[in-house]
Amino acid sequence: MKQPERGFTLLEVMLALAIFAALSLAASQVMNGVMRNDEASARKEARLAELQRGFSLMERDFSQIVPRRSQGYELGFYAERYQLSSADWAVSFIRNGWLNPLGIMPRSELQRVGYRLRGDTLERLFYDSSEPLSTQEPAVRPVLTGVTGFVLRFFGKDGWQERWDDPANLPQGIAIVVTLRDYGEITRIFLITPRYGAATQRRSER
């Protein structure tokens, strides 16, 4: 005798739908988690690239400090807190090595640059000459974001100092301490060669 065909009961259909919905939700959560991880990784990579570019730029500048009389500063170098409209320390100096291939541009390879903290951004100031006019405004380039502190220390014949008041000599070394909101305190130390103003870099992070 032929058995009557039997369809799905309402309970079985509802159970199947519930299982399908649960699986879909789980898959969606996994996908969202993967996307969030990818976004977080991309943000971290972008941040690390920003830090690398910023500290490389500072290394190029500080490694080419030269002693040169400028606008009342015997060596063209000064560093003070709250100068240059900075929220913390600021520094200004003359550097060599400003590229001028074949001397095409009507200028030397010397350039005045500076660093300051504005808001939470470490900025680089630069002029189109080593002797800018007093009324000339510098060009401004953001270097690092998320900065909560910018401190300078100076190494001289008496060791590390919190100020540099010797107008006749460059410091033998400069420590730059940058405090970041996400990575904390990072220190770069530049050793300045007295004769040429060239500097090499040492690094410490904590």
UniProtKB/Swiss-Prot annotation:
SUPFAM superfamilies: Pili subunits. It is a single-pass membrane protein. Keywords: Cell inner membrane, Cell membrane, Membrane, Methylation, Protein transport, Transmembrane, Transmembrane helix, Transport. The keyword Coiled coil does not apply. Cleaved by prepilin peptidase. InterPro entries: N_methyl_site, Pilin-like, T2SS_protein-GspJ, T2SS_protein_J. Its main location: membrane. It is found in: Cell inner membrane. The chain crosses the membrane at residues 8-28. Residues 1-7 form a propeptide. One of its GO terms (biological process) is protein secretion by the type II secretion system. Type II secretion is composed of four main components: the outer membrane complex, the inner membrane complex, the cytoplasmic secretion ATPase and the periplasm-spanning pseudopilus. Interacts with core component OutG. Belongs to the GSP J family. This is Type II secretion system protein J. It comes from Dickeya chrysanthemi.
